[in-house]
Amino acid sequence: MNKQIDLPIADVQGSLDTRHIAIDRVGIKAIRHPVVVADKGGGSQHTVAQFNMYVNLPHNFKGTHMSRFVEILNSHEREISVESFEEILRSMVSRLESDSGHIEMAFPYFINKSAPVSGVKSLLDYEVTFIGEIKHGNQYSFTMKVIVPVTSLCPCSKKISDYGAHNQRSHVTISVRTNSFIWIEDIIRIAEEQASCELYGLLKRPDEKYVTERAYNNPKFVEDIVRDVAEVLNHDDRIDAYIVESENFESIHNHSAYALIERDKRIR
């Protein structure tokens, strides 16, 4: 019987690439993984996040080691927070032997809200994304992005109509870079308080009357919403930079109204 000879398996990814063109981002995209996220109430939420994970690739390497991205995710089963998110990113850059890295973690986040009159409780979901980036081996930046569904009511429609006004569901998207800790709930409240009215998962008839009249008494253009949110963010010392967007899904048109304000408060 011939004896089997174990030969080393070639590392194709680590071989030399002769084109000498560096790649800015390479990795895995849209991989789902269970996570645990801390909430402001002192508890935590078990949810499923979708990850995009990338590193840079020097010009002399043929490829990156894709399996290592999954191994890194599997090694972080514990609670994920703003602080541990940086740890995951740094371990990825180190493990892949790169100078820069980028991770996006998008997940649904739930808040148990009380209806404004009846007090009945129900969950409402929000879209949250953590975005972390390391450049030049050490420079770390973190962005939190939250999409908040709200109600907007048109001031012009109210002004020119004998009764009623068109209103619609809107998305207020706030992306912030901070210098100190800020809860997801804090960002959500900023958006909801500047809308014509906030949304609820469950409403009884007295609640429905309240939110209808609340929106009617608080009409806002898409421009009003982004300006009002920006004004709050300008006065929040925890926030260094932000992008605030508002998209109104117009009920009387087959298109949306949209506005955006971007500011880096560190630049005078």
From Swiss-Prot:
Enzyme category, top tier: hydrolase
Catalysis performed (reactions): GTP + H2O = 7,8-dihydroneopterin 3'-triphosphate + formate + H(+)
Gene3D superfamilies: Urate Oxidase (3.10.270.10)
Keyword Plastid: no
The keyword Membrane is assigned to this record: no
Positions bearing the site annotation: May be catalytically important: C154
Keywords carried by this UniProt record: Hydrolase
PANTHER family for the chain: GTP CYCLOHYDROLASE MPTA (PTHR36445:SF1)
Name of protein: GTP cyclohydrolase FolE2
